[in-house]
UniProtKB/Swiss-Prot annotation:
Listed CDD domains: fungal_TF_MHR (cd12148), GAL4 (cd00067)
Superkingdom per UniProt: Eukaryota
Sample GO molecular function, one term: zinc ion binding
Protein name from the UniProt record: Uncharacterized transcriptional regulatory protein PB1A11.04c
Length: 697
């Protein structure tokens, strides 16, 4: 047997794969071999693509002790910066736009942004404009003395300064001249504020909530309702996180060392009630988010006081105020007898609390009207058991319980509107909201498009058909007198030269009043000649809304609605044969909803019929007298106008742009507002209102 011979163990050669120390980004993504040639590897050269190389990492690194020595001096610098956010002026580059200063903001991490803001003197001017024109919905949220000193010393939070500038620049003539339009001036600062918000969302603070509310109002006025609701929802989520709906201290009047100061607690209350007011003000509309009202905004869960008077907040004078339901906090009821007379006398002498309570009434009434109003009630509205009567009594009770300084009088109005008094905006807006709510409620029982008749009861025909009986005459007269008085008040107050409020809600109030004035002009003036003066106010409504549409896009949409409704009233009630036949009177959504209008001005309707296209192609002079109320130069009715209704025609008419608001310009706008029912042959005759005459007040 042959023995096997053992061979020496020969080590196997190791297979060596040639690798490069670093591969380009494209080869690394495609997982292919990279030749490592620079500036372009072989694979990228063959594919004729750009070869991108990552930065070469530092292989050695630094010692831990060295890193600790480097970061230790910076610890004291980063901590205070997160709270104060100071901004300091730097050198303006020659290529930058013509602005006054450039501010460098070092935010979290390595994120850096360059912000260009005006000088402190210019910021103080914009701050003053903001207090006069835009300090309405958020009245009381700012400590004016603190914000003024921060702006003067360049220590104000930059994002808050940008939000204030975004509101004030819209009404500053200097900023409008610089940016060519009020919208561009506002968007310039608003966009910079939006760019700073993402890096601040991890910091839930009162400043961030305030900025979100300010930007929400800007988006609402710009006809971007969905974005406004998104910003408001984020602010309410921060309110829930901070639990602002509950008192921090056991006793709201104490200022112990273990609790926050009274001024800080009052500031948190004011931020909470500002969120409450904005949410209640914008809660009307079918598209309003139903689940946005968070738990902290529920009145059953709220246990904080209403805001105190403005002087107490500015001068840090603690005072006890009521809760929303009118009661005092439970932990202070036993101490009310020992309170100072000054504190007891001023418990009800505040205006912000009355405005907050009114906003809740507006929210409930608008939601009730949008859900059907009296048509969903089984009790006639003139009976005490009806929801309409209960809402009406709540409004009357609110008005009767106003403190003496908040009651409407020309003396109070002049005192609040004096220079340097910022409470005038709150005082004016409160009474404007009250009469808007009252008009909104009483209008629900009226027929805005009644049948042609000289009987006043025809204005309540829907109520009569709904409950099978005619309303009492006294009740109908009371409703008409109240709604006309409130509508006239809205128009006259909006036109008053002492009123500087530029809130977009004023435009909605004007539109609400204009619906009553158009009803008077075309349907009621023949019934009662006492309403002639009120019917003429529709031209004032048109002028006011036209002026405010220059600043807010949402008011532009309301102006178009007013013009279209005015055209319809003329064509419906001045013709022998009506253009449209109504079976069930109703309300168009455009006069009921506030806060959800989207910008559709740039959208065109591709379904324009050939008749409308032919009409647009014709010159304006060819249609000046076609379908006008009266022939120029005499008092005889124009063709197609009924002689019976000529006594309702005034010498001046609202000028209407036919390319925008003609009843024939868009075949779909009527379906969107009223429904699809119309007469078949209404387009056979051209009806245009293009007289072009100006408004004479």
């Amino acid at each position: 047997m042959i023995a096997a011979v053992e061979k020496d163990a020969v080590p196997r050669k190791r297979r060596v794969i040639s690798q490069v120390s670093q591969a380009c980004i494209r080869c690394r993504q495609k997982k292919i071999k990279c030749s490592g040639e620079k500036p372009s590897c072989q694979a990228c050269s063959n594919n004729k693509v750009e070869c991108i190389w990552p930065d070469r990492p530092n292989m050695r690194g630094k010692k831990p002790s060295s890193a600790a020595r480097t970061l230790s001096p910076l610890t004291g610098i980063v901590q205070p910066y997160l709270g104060s956010h100071p901004f300091s002026p730097t050198i303006l580059s020659p290529s930058s736009p013509n602005m006054d200063f450039t501010y460098s903001i070092n935010s979290f991490g390595d994120y850096q942004k360059q912000l260009r803001l005006p000088t402190s003197r210019k910021l103080l001017q914009l701050w003053d404009i903001f207090l006069k024109t835009s300090y309405t919905e958020l009245f009381g949220i700012f400590n004016k003395a603190q914000i003024t000193s921060q702006i003067a010393s360049d220590t104000a939070p930059p994002v808050l300064v940008l939000c204030i500038c975004a509101h004030a620049a819209r009404f500053s003539q200097e900023e409008v001249n610089r940016f060519k339009s009020s919208t561009a001036a506002s968007d310039y600062y608003a966009n910079q504020a939006f760019s700073l918000l993402p890096c601040r969302f991890q910091d839930i603070s009162l400043t961030n909530i305030t900025c979100l509310l300010l930007l929400c109002l800007i988006e609402l006025g710009s006809c971007r309702g969905a974005k406004a609701w998104l910003l408001l929802g984020m602010a309410l989520r921060m309110v829930d996180s901070l639990d602002l709906g509950n008192e921090i201290n056991d006793n709201p009047l104490t200022m112990g060392s273990n609790t926050v100061s009274w001024t800080e607690a009052e500031q948190k209350r004011r931020v909470y009630w500002a969120c409450f007011f904005v949410e209640r003000l914008l809660s009307t509309g079918y598209m309003a988010p139903s689940k946005l009202r968070s738990l902290s905004l529920s009145l059953q869960k709220t246990s904080i006081q209403l805001p105190c008077p403005e002087p107490n907040f500015l001068f840090n004078q603690p005072i006890l105020t009521e809760l929303f339901d009118g009661s005092l906090p439970e932990n202070t009821q036993s101490d009310t007898t020992s309170m100072a007379p000054y504190q007891r006398s001023l418990q009800l002498e505040f205006m912000t609390g009355s405005l907050i309570r009114l906003s809740n009434l507006w929210s409930e009434i608008s939601r009730w009207a949008l859900c059907g109003g009296y048509t969903k009630d089984i009790t006639p509205p003139w009976l005490n058991q009806s929801q309409f009567h209960r809402s009406f009594e709540l409004l009357k009770a609110w008005h009767e319980n106003l403190p003496p300084r908040a009651v409407w009088s020309y003396t109070n109005y002049s005192a609040y509107s004096s220079p340097g008094e910022s409470a005038g905006a709150c005082y004016t807006f409160m009474h404007l909201l009250y009469h808007t709510t009252l008009t909104y409620l009483l209008r629900n029982v009226l027929d805005l498009f009644p049948e042609k008749s000289r009987q006043k009861s025809k204005l309540f025909s829907s109520v009569s058909q709904r409950f099978g009986q005619q309303p009492p005459t006294v009740w109908m007269d009371m409703i008409l007198d109240q709604v006309i008085t409130s509508a006239d008040f809205i128009t006259k107050l909006s036109k008053d030269p002492l009123n500087y409020i530029m809130s977009p809600f004023v435009g909605f109030s004007i539109l609400t009043a204009a619906t009553i004035h158009m009803l008077l002009k075309f349907c009621v003036v023949n019934i009662d000649q006492n309403y002639i003066s009120s019917s003429r106010l529709v031209h004032v409504d048109h002028q006011i809304l036209q002026d405010r549409s220059k600043y807010w896009k949402i008011n532009q949409a309301m102006l178009v609605t007013l013009q279209r409704l005015y055209n319809f009233y003329r064509f419906q009630y001045l013709e022998e044969q009506s253009l449209y036949n109504f079976k069930i009177p109703g309300f168009p959504l455009c006069i009921l909803e506030y806060g959800i209008v989207e910008d559709q001005s740039m959208k065109s309707n591709p379904d324009l019929n050939s008749f409308s296209k032919e009409l647009f192609s014709r010159g304006t002079n060819e249609l000046l007298n076609n379908g006008d109320d009266t022939q120029s130069g005499n008092s005889t009715p124009a063709m197609g106008v009924s002689e019976i209704r000529t006594d309702t025609i005034l010498d001046e008419e609202v000028p209407v742009d036919p390319l925008i608001t003609s009843i024939l310009d868009d075949g779909r706008w009527w379906e969107e507002m009223f429904g699809s029912e119309r007469k078949a042959g209404f387009k056979e005759t051209v009806f245009e209102d293009m007289n072009g005459r100006s408004i004479r007040l």
